């Protein structure tokens, strides 16, 4: 197992992301978290959708920094099971949950624009920007987040296949400590720590977002086909921020 130096890393070394990622690839997920918390910019936070396998990163981060802010974007259209799952994990793991919501209510948005998620790619993109991207950008700015942890994994979709452990977005560093994990790795971690999948997992939901644009997985489908009618996988948070 490759070990990174314990001494502080200079900003110039931090800018050499290719070399840094090569070293991070040789570490376990918990070591990546520990390293990023020690060497990354101040004000770390974790974003979570409280989706199918979210308990992994919530546990991984809260074990090392119990008070780390956990950002949940409440679009107003999450499954009831997601809200209950968030409540249960927040209580069990004693999470420092920070809930951010869109500036416009569901009713007002629909009065202005109709059901945007039914209006093709243009409508879906507008919906995602209003209800997901803007609140997340606001959360990261208000919390002055310098090190942003995510639960992105390469095996989740073709668009995420090249996800690095660390990337730079503006002045912010984005860390995906389980980027190289498979579904089996996730299952083993959940089993080892007696952590649950999202309640809808057992009903065939493998990627869980808003109730109107999430469908059960069926044989022959890719995971990304279960979101946004198969038109796209990403909501924009991990593309535009």
Curated annotation (Swiss-Prot):
Gene3D superfamilies: HUPs
Active site: 235 (nucleophile)
Pathway stated in the Swiss-Prot or TrEMBL entry: Sulfur metabolism; hydrogen sulfide biosynthesis; sulfite from sulfate: step 3/3
Cytoplasm among keywords: yes
Taxonomy, superkingdom: Bacteria
Subcellular location per the Swiss-Prot or TrEMBL entry: Cytoplasm
InterPro entries noted in UniProt: PAPS/APS_Rdtase (IPR004511), PAPS_reduct_dom (IPR002500), PAPS_reductase_CysH (IPR011800), Rossmann-like_a/b/a_fold (IPR014729)
Keywords recorded for this protein, A-Z: Cytoplasm, Oxidoreductase
Any one GO CC term of the record: cytoplasm
Any Gene Ontology biological process: hydrogen sulfide biosynthetic process
E.C. designation(s): 1.8.4.8
One function term, GO molecular function aspect: phosphoadenylyl-sulfate reductase (thioredoxin) activity
Catalytic activity from the UniProt record: [thioredoxin]-disulfide + sulfite + adenosine 3',5'-bisphosphate + 2 H(+) = [thioredoxin]-dithiol + 3'-phosphoadenylyl sulfate
Family statement: Belongs to the PAPS reductase family. CysH subfamily.
Function: Catalyzes the formation of sulfite from phosphoadenosine 5'-phosphosulfate (PAPS) using thioredoxin as an electron donor.
Name the UniProt record assigns to this protein: Phosphoadenosine 5'-phosphosulfate reductase
Species of origin: Xanthomonas axonopodis pv. citri (strain 306)
Gene that specifies this protein: cysH
């Amino acid at each position: 197992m490759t070990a990174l130096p314990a001494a502080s890393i200079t900003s110039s070394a931090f800018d050499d992301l290719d070399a840094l990622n090569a070293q991070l690839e040789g570490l376990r997920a918990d070591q990546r978290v520990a390293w990023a918390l020690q060497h990354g910019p101040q004000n770390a936070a974790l974003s979570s959708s409280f989706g199918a396998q979210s308990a992994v990163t919530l546990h991984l981060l809260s074990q090392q920094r119990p008070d780390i802010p956990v950002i949940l974007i409440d679009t107003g259209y999450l499954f009831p099971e997601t809200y209950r799952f968030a409540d249960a994990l927040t209580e069990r793991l004693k999470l420092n949950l920070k809930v951010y919501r869109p500036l416009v209510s569901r009713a007002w948005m629909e009065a202005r624009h109709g059901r945007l998620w039914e209006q093709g790619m243009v409508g879906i993109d507008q919906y995602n920007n209003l209800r997901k991207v803007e609140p997340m950008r606001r959360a990261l700015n208000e919390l002055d987040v310098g090190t942003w942890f995510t639960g992105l994994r390469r095996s989740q979709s073709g668009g995420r296949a090249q996800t690095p452990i660390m990337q730079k977005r503006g002045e912010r560093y984005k860390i995906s400590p389980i980027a190289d994990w498979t579904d089996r790795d996730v299952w083993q971690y959940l089993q080892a720590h007696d952590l649950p999948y999202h309640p809808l997992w057992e009903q065939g939901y493998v990627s869980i977002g808003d109730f109107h644009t999430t469908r059960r997985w069926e044989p022959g489908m890719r995971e990304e086909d279960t979101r946004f009618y198969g038109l796209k996988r990403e909501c924009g948070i991990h593309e535009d921020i």
